[in-house]
Amino acid sequence: MPVRVSEFSWQQTPAALFLSLPLRGVCVRDADVFCGESYLKVNFPPFLFEVFLYAPIDDGKSKAKIGNDTILFTLYKKEPVLWESLSMPGVDKEMMQRIREKSILQAQEKAKEATEAKAAAKREDQRYALGEMMKIEEEERKKIEDMKENERKKATRELEAWKECQKKADGQKRVQRKEKPLQGKQAEERGALKPQSLPRKAPPTRLPTRGRNWENIFSEKLKEDRVPAPRSAGSIQISFTPRVFPTALRESQVAEEEEWLHKQAEARRAMSTDLPEFSDLKEEEKNPDWLKDKGNKLFATENYLAAIDAYNLAIRLNRKIPVLYLNRAACHLKLKNLHKAIEDSSKALELLTPPVADNANARMKAHVRRGTAFCQLELYVEGLQDYEAALKIDPANTVVQNDAEKIRNIIQGTTLKSHD
């Protein structure tokens, strides 16, 4: 039975009450204080002090200061009046028990509200951090796009300048081609004037020679001005076999591959962006692919909780994309949420059907991640089954082979110990 303390002193004003309680040599670390609206208790073994207050107080503003073997309480009254006494008069045991239980329930409700408020503030902080990160990356993306646009404009200006130079050069060449025949004609005319000034010495056989020279001049001009006609246009029709998968037709499973492609197309159309809870999101935040890339970047920076938030939002938008569950399983593995990693890996395997070459790598990763989670839960037999399923998909993967061999050794060692 604790020893009840009756030695204390108190003073009051209309707004507050001051209570001094000696600890009687007990270490202050062993003192436990509980304060409610109508109930105050201090437990410092082997002593116990409790009082059922005359009127309600504001336990949120009230405070206690411990020091020098004394606890000094400053209790703020809800109604600014002077009390006739510290404790409530005429209180029996049943009423005391009711007041105690009521005070404990009120304290529990306040603690629950404080926990919920703290969790809500934490979620808001995470959302704000994610939004700020998205904003920074959007600014970087815009900056890169502006740089690309400036480079494109610069290249366009340089190309236009080059075209203008080419036009000027072509114009000069055309002028030169036109001037050459005129210069030849003038030279011929000067040569024709010389025999007229000396007719006696001019041989009669030079007239046809002059005619041949004129023919040569015009023939050269025609050769220079003659431009070949453009070639006639033509078109060649080419059609390819519509094969989406790279495997040979004799080795592929056409029906399964078509079913897989059909499921992928349906998954892309299965969006839930019209829900009221998504009305405050930006357009890019409603894109599961954009959220997946965002989660991948957060995973690369080891911010696994934020990555899970991004994958969660993407899954709420579209629940039929297996890679979202696969990536979230990797985050849960990093955070040791092993049961959730198993659930996400199983959901990814459920969506990765039918098994075709296009989803082989994803199925192998899902088996490995689920097997890893089983092994960390010490369920080695189940883990080995997943690793063997992964090896059936990719038999040449040496990492998976080595891990499967280690699991076999662990299982064999456990079996030998049980026999011993």
Swiss-Prot record:
Gene3D superfamilies: 2.60.40.790, Tetratricopeptide repeat domain. Residues 7-103 are annotated as: Mediates interaction with ESR1 and STUB1. The keyword Repeat applies. Keywords: Cell projection, Cytoplasm, Neurogenesis, Nucleus, Repeat, TPR repeat. This is Dynein axonemal assembly factor 4. GO terms for molecular function: nuclear estrogen receptor binding. GO terms for cellular component: centrosome; cytoplasm; dynein axonemal particle; extracellular region; neuron projection; non-motile cilium; nucleus. Residues 3-87 form the CS domain. InterPro entries: CS_dom, CS_DYX1C1, Dynein_assembly_factor_4, HSP20-like_chaperone, TPR-like_helical_dom_sf, TPR_rpt. It is found in: Nucleus; Cytoplasm; Cell projection, Neuron projection; Dynein axonemal particle. Interacts with ZMYND10. Interacts with STUB1. Interacts with ESR1 and ESR2. Interacts with DNAAF2. Interacts with CCT3, CCT4, CCT5 and CCT8. Interacts with DNAAF6/PIH1D3. Involved in neuronal migration during development of the cerebral neocortex. May regulate the stability and proteasomal degradation of the estrogen receptors that play an important role in neuronal differentiation, survival and plasticity. Axonemal dynein assembly factor required for ciliary motility. SMART domains: TPR. TPR repeats lie at residues 288-321, 323-355, 364-397. Residues 165-192 have a biased composition (Basic and acidic residues). It comes from the Eukaryota. Pfam families: CS. GO terms for biological process: cilium movement; determination of left/right symmetry; epithelial cilium movement involved in extracellular fluid movement; establishment of localization in cell; heart development; inner dynein arm assembly; learning or memory; neuron migration. Residues 165-212 are annotated as: Disordered.
